[in-house]
């Protein structure tokens, strides 16, 4: 069988679902990391009022907020993928990670766009691909409200 011996149809679908969410988590982690690196380079090289943008307090604060989102996503993705890879119960981790992706990844990308100014929305600029992929992933996961409902249902059934 595709997903292992001894699995019935429902178990196979559940396993495939867990693998898909884990893969999305890992992909989202790399996506935000790449977009953050691109933005960090941009604000270090772009000058305004004779100084790099990165030296302005408001820019540093916004990058710091995105960094917190990125680190949280990284830890959540790592935990989810590790639990799935070990065959452990990963459903809680996967639900929380999927919620974090749907709720926090698109706003983080908006901040990174803001820090790029007008260049970030140019379809030929790399940030555009990062951002459009982030939006697609959030939609693929069902959006933040749907994911929060799943997390809430899981918590209320404890």
State what each model feature region is.
Residues 18-158:
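Alpha-helical interface subdomain recognition
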Residues 1-19:
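A short, charged helix-loop
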């Amino acid at each position: 069988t595709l997903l292992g011996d001894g699995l019935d149809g429902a178990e196979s679908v559940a396993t495939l679902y867990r693998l898909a969410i884990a893969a999305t988590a890992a992909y989202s982690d790399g996506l935000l990391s790449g977009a953050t690196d691109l933005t960090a380079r941009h604000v270090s090289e772009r000058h305004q009022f004779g100084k790099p943008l990165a030296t302005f307090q408001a820019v540093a604060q916004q990058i710091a907020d995105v960094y917190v989102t990125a680190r949280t996503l990284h830890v959540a993705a790592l935990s989810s993928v590790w639990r799935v890879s070990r065959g452990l119960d990963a459903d809680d981790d996967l639900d929380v990670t999927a919620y974090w992706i749907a709720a926090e990844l698109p706003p983080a990308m908006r901040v990174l766009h803001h820090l790029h100014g007008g260049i970030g929305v140019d379809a030929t600029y790399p940030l555009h691909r990062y951002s459009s992929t982030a939006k697609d992933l959030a939609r693929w996961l069902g959006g933040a409200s749907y994911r929060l409902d799943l997390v809430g249902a899981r918590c209320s059934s404890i």
